[in-house]
Amino acid sequence: MEINYAEYAKIFKVLSDPKRLKILDMLSGGELCACKIQEEFNITQPTLSHDMRLLCESGLVNPRREGKWTHYSLNMEKMNELYKTIGQLMLPEQFLGVLDCKCK
């Protein structure tokens, strides 16, 4: 699997915000309406919209419109891809060249 480093750098930047990490944790329990997420954080609707836009643009979250409300769920395909990529980045074989370097 070839890694798109620019794409994953953007995803990790999105994940670097504690509030967005907590939103992902909340969504791990299943789909949630935006109003439930907003209640948890006691934030304004524009602030929530900004965070959810970043999560959706990263591909980690799927939006679903129902009337005037938006419901959010984890994109499990993208989450599994993220887990595999992190694993690939952390494989010992990836670091052997660095460990064997004689120029220290």
Describe these PLM feature segments:
Residues 51:
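Residues within the DNA-recognition helix of helix-turn-helix
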Residues 3-46, 66-80:
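N-terminal helix-turn-helix DNA-binding core of bacterial DNA-binding proteins
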Residues 39, 56-57:
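Alpha-helical residues within the helix-turn-helix
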